[in-house]
């Protein structure tokens, strides 16, 4: 099995060869898209984006998250546009609304304090508060990012991922304390360290637990879809609507493509209104927003988390902030956060040691990237 670095190297070889596709999908972040841009292997798409008003479809924030880089591949989130997603992908709080009603909980939490209070209510009622699985790393990475936004602001998370500073914000220690406190309080699934986020989502779909954290790409089918909700993680302020919200693997045009104009037309179509309606009809989240999502969701009979995935996405793109996945900050941060956070929540390391481990990965990479740009 090839590792991520091997896959990036393979794509580099493919795009630098003689038999190059006109369009290709790429991974976002410094470890993939940044390397391809820096190697001069992709064509900027700004001319098509301007002519077809792609920012009007997806919002400039989302375009920047998925595909903007400086030409040297060293600065993410600004510069030329090199890739555009056709489908949306965002991380939110799944809630068993039926179980919440049984516990006397009126609706989704709007602050972290409300979330904690609702988890306490669930625990007292014999319900697992938070279905949590850590063995694949994703859920604790998402939780860390959401807690950081709630403790500070979405802009702080943006700055961390883009590497604005070589030092992590001091509030990261508060986040670490919260993660450890929740584990020690017994909010998480029994045996959480050995379970994946997919494992616990399946258990949640069967009726276990009050909450879980997962992505819109994992919307599940249920015999009682009206019993479940999917909402953004509570940040505590109506003006702070934000979530980890990017796209499926975005489309890019190789520099050596033989038909670059045709390739751009394909990207324009696959992100346009006709394709978006097809995505919704199939229960998927289109990256582009039309303003007609509510009518299309109703017309296609989507309810519960299937409807929420699309409608909440449209609201995020239109009225909120779309944040990159935090592990995009360095090529190795996913593994660093996953391993260190598991040790943190298991009580094997202190919050201070957790932050030190993240900084030891983040600081040198960010400094080297800045020095070479």
Question: What role is predicted for each listed range?
Answer:
Residues 1-39, 51, 107, 237-239, ...:
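Conserved N-terminal structural module of periplasmic/extracytoplasmic solute-binding proteins
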Residues 72-86, 91, 116-164, 200, ...:
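Extracytoplasmic/periplasmic solute-binding protein
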Residues 119-121, 161-192, 224:
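Glycine-centered hinge/linker elements that transmit conformational signals in sensory
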Residues 46-61, 134, 151-174, 235-244, ...:
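Short, solvent-exposed loop/beta-turn-alpha elements that line the ligand-binding surface or hinge
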Residues 2-10, 112-116, 191-205:
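Short helix-initiation/N-cap motifs at beta->coil->alpha
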Residues 185, 223-286, 339, 349:
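Extracytoplasmic/periplasmic substrate-recognition and gating elements
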Residues 31-90:
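Hinge/lid segment of periplasmic solute-binding proteins
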Residues 160-161, 307-362:
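C-terminal capping/gating helix-and-loop segments adjacent to ligand/active sites or protein-protein/ligand interfaces
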